[in-house]
């Protein structure tokens, strides 16, 4: 999934930097694909519209959890204007399910997910219980 999203980022003119220091093999592969795939799709799309055009993925152990952190540059604050993170795509009936699906996958794996912004970056911070 990371290779595929890295290629997509490159096509979009976005630099995707990935640091992976732990495997996620104890989790259902379909949940990992939903979580990482949607998080990176969103990050790449937002970074493409930003000045910095970078997105980062960090997967690492954090105590009893596995941490998945995806961050991207943003042009303007996201959460102030769109706190529910509703889709901004024109075809709203076909879009807007990514974050919902991510939440369900995180919950199935006894995890937690939060979104925040810092230094002109949007961050999706996920912890999954090992």
Which residues are covered by each model-predicted region?
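Conserved short strand/loop->alpha-helix "switch" segment adjacent to the catalytic nucleotide/phosphoryl-transfer site
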Residues: 16-36
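Glycine-rich nucleotide-binding loop
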Residues: 76, 118-125
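Conserved glycine-/histidine-rich ATP-lid loop and adjacent helix of the Bergerat-fold HATPase_c
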Residues: 101-111
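Conserved ATP-binding N-box helix of the HATPase_c
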Residues: 29-52, 105
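Short beta-strand/loop element within the Bergerat-fold HATPase_c
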Residues: 50, 54-64
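Heptad-repeat coiled-coil segments of the DHp/HisKA dimerization-phosphoacceptor module
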Residues: 16-22, 61-63, 74, 117
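Glycine-rich/acidic phosphate-handling loop/turn and adjacent ATP-lid/helix
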Residues: 66-97
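Short beta-to-alpha transition helix within the HATPase_c
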Residues: 1-12, 66
